[in-house]
Amino acid sequence: MSQQHLLNVCLPLEDPGSLFEIIINDDRYEKITKQPSYLQRKDFKTLEALNSSSDSFIDCQGYVLLPGFVDAHMHLDKAYSLSKVPNASGTLQEAVINYRKQSPHFTVEEIEYRAMKTALNALSHGTTAIRTHVNFELPLGEDVVFRALTAVLNVKEKLKQYITIQVIPMFLLPDDDSKRELEWIEQAIKMGADGIGGAPHLAENPEKQIDGLFSLAEKYDKPIDLHVDESDDPNVCTLDYIIQKTMERQFHNRVVAGHLCSLAPMEQEKALSLIERMAAAQIGAVTLPGANMYLQGRFDQGIVRRGVTRIHEILQSGATLAAASDNVHDPFHPFGKADLLQIGLLTAYVAHLGSGEGLKQIIRMITEYPAKLLNLNNYGVRCGAKASFVLLKARSVEDIFTNLPVERYVFRNGKLLYQSKKAEHWNDRQLLMYQHETESQYVKFERNLQYV
């Protein structure tokens, strides 16, 4: 039986003013108790002194522990393709066209390389679960259509003991009900798809697409995760029909809608009505602030729309809302590094969530809420749950988003998988002394900080 013992842990979502002692037995949390004070134990290693996954007694020094991040919407197959697929206009339309043109030239091996690189980057930043959408372009033919899915499934298998990866093929059902192409879709599901995906708002007949996707989900008992209304045109609104189908087919808690950009410019009463109905149908939502801010509002002048959905209204409705990475260094989004703290910071900016409570909500949007959307069992920092977590060199949620700490210690099922240490050194003795003095004053000025 393996055991780990952690002292002086900060759990900001539990009680930011207290420190906790945590005992992990055989990859699960066994004991989580509030400490009466900061504990000094010489037999415990500090985070800086950790050198292997076998270190069992850890003094966390008041640093933050969060459950492993959950990235509810990525595109592992497209990531790091920007050098081969440019997007001069910066529009969604050009990104789609250019990526489709280049797709026949991508081998399974290359796609697998890019997907693996992205998954490892995500894991190193603290993400322990990913849901990735994968292109499945029927018009490209049988030789090409399965490449991305095959590559990402290979990565999922190789990393299964380290990170949870759910794979969602993006289906565009053929208009002519081609038997051969429908067989390809069913083959893709049987290969190991974890759900049914698509972008029906881009189809010529969105309602027919939605009907077909729900039928596939029913037939194979799969959840649905769709790109929905990724447009700054308020008249683009497939969400209405998706809500209808969710209610009719009794797919409550089994449908996720990503993007929802057109809700933002939509007339207030209509948007709020849709959000209320979405919450009643128990449809989950994912906001993608990086890609949406980059792609949307391209033709605006003066006041440029942010392109991000109505975050406050969705949260207030009671619907589950996650924030996720979407694309990483590709024609849809040229930036990013699969770091959900970076995405959390973008979300905080765009939704004006900068207060202490607002930042806690951001943390939930990259942990607890997406875990619910992905139906992850045994998740969270609680007794009996799997001990998958990230320790950050930060002492509060405000500290996290002020500094985006580089130093992170990533654990999966109680095992240390990755640690990053920031190399720092003041070459001037006087500056070094000031630095040490500043660090020593943390307890006096910040540890028990209360807002007036």
What are these regions (language model features)?
Residues 62, 73, 126, 196, ...:
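Divalent metal-coordination and catalytic microenvironments
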Residues 98-114, 168-179, 199-203:
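Active-site mouth loops of central-metabolism enzymes
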Residues 1-43, 48, 360-452:
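Active-site microenvironment of metallo-dependent hydrolases
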Residues 65, 82-133, 144-160, 186-189:
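Alpha-helical scaffold segments that flank or form the walls of functional sites
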Residues 223, 244-255, 291, 295, ...:
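His/Asp/Glu-enriched, well-ordered alpha-helical/loop segment
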Residues 79-111, 220, 238-256, 279-284, ...:
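Active-site gating loops and adjacent loop-to-helix segments of metal-dependent hydrolytic enzymes
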Residues 147-157, 177-284, 301-323, 379:
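Histidine/acidic residue-rich metal-binding segments in metalloenzymes
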